[in-house]
């Protein structure tokens, strides 16, 4: 597909012109410009699609079983361990990895790093998908998902950390949908919608910074609910929120690096030259950002240990594991 940019460089219009000079219809765009036979062949020869089919074949029946027979039918949750794998990994794992959206949005829209613009949309898409699936995981692992709106409307609980997380994640998900909307409007050739979103992009970015910073820190503060279940070397009541926030910075940047590398390797036929030519250069730039974030994380980690007087724990077995983690996962990268 040919891609051309009209005179207004701030509003690139992707028309995807057909070889005969016509414009692709929405239906043809959905089929990626391929015939049904070509699309089917492309689908079947992609090994990732077969892996997804296998995952869905196992996961969908379990998901239906969870909703028809209850949470206990598919998990080993208890009152001592009420949060399962979906909630533990989906919320505390996916949300930091999804920080790429507000990080790249801040860099490009606020700090003027236009050299990072070619990968900004990829970062925004990563963030949107990560937060969306975090909400999906939450609906799966919460005992009564039909009451998910209670902390937002009926039983507010403004003094609770979970109230902050619920409101901010839901609001930030809406902000991310708006931030990625210009890409959809380009695809649908609706320029008025794109111009409107572009006109409020600074406000959306600032809202994303505020919301993401607060709920990333709030997720770290959730560990203060159960301090006895976390080893002192990994727990510091005064610094827990900033530990989580700093880890989200290098996790989000690392996610963009991996996604860009995968796109360049396996989806080059769908990427324009501007993106492909910028991947290596921006990988180095994001790598430097990760290094600074890791240094900051390590310093704050040591400050937390010193503040809580936990040096003696470093001589225990868990202390050796902690030092190994810091060496392999922080110092070496």
Residue ranges and their predicted role:
Residues 36-45, 65-69, 79-87, 152-161, ...:
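Membrane-interface segments at the starts/ends of alpha-helical transmembrane spans
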Residues 81-146:
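Membrane helical hairpin/interfacial module
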Residues 19-35, 97-116, 175-191, 255, ...:
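Cytoplasmic juxtamembrane interface segments
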Residues 118-181:
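Intramembrane catalytic core of multi-pass membrane enzymes that act on lipidic substrates
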Residues 2-100, 104:
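N-terminal signal-anchor module of multipass membrane proteins
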Residues 4, 66-76, 108-116, 120, ...:
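Juxtamembrane/interface segments at transmembrane-helix termini
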Residues 63-75, 139-149, 216-228, 302-306:
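Membrane-helix interface motif
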Residues 55, 59, 115, 153, ...:
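Long, contiguous internal "core" modules enriched in hydrophobic/ aromatic residues
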């Amino acid at each position: 597909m040919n891609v051309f940019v009209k005179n207004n460089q701030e509003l690139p219009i992707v028309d995807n012109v057909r070889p005969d000079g016509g414009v692709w219809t929405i239906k043809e765009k959905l089929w990626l410009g391929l015939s049904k036979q070509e699309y089917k062949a492309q689908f079947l020869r992609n090994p990732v699609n077969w892996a997804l089919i296998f995952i869905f074949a196992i996961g969908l029946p379990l998901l239906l079983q969870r909703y028809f027979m209850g949470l206990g039918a598919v998990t080993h949750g208890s009152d001592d361990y009420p949060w399962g794998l979906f909630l533990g990994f989906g919320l505390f794992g996916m949300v930091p990895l999804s920080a790429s959206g507000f990080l790249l949005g801040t860099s490009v829209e606020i700090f003027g790093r236009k050299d990072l613009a070619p990968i900004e949309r990829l970062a925004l898409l990563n963030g949107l998908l990560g937060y969306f699936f975090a909400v999906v995981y939450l609906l799966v692992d919460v005992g009564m998902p039909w009451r998910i709106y209670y902390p937002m409307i009926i039983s507010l609980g403004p003094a609770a950390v979970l109230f902050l997380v619920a409101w901010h994640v839901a609001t930030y998900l809406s902000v991310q949908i708006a931030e990625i909307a210009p890409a959809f409007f380009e695809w649908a050739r609706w320029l008025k919608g794109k111009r409107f979103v572009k006109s409020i992009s600074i406000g959306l970015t600032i809202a994303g910074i505020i919301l993401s910073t607060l709920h990333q820190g709030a997720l770290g503060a959730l560990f203060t609910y159960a301090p006895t279940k976390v080893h002192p070397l990994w727990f510091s009541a005064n610094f827990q929120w900033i530990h989580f926030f700093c880890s989200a910075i290098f996790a989000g940047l690392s996610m963009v690096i991996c996604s860009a590398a995968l796109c360049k390797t396996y989806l080059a036929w769908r990427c324009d030259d501007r993106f492909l030519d910028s991947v290596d250069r921006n990988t180095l730039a994001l790598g430097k950002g990760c290094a600074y974030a890791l240094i900051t994380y390590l310093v704050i980690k040591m400050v937390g240990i010193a503040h809580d007087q936990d040096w003696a724990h470093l001589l225990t077995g868990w202390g050796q594991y902690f030092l190994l983690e810091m060496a392999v996962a922080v110092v070496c990268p």
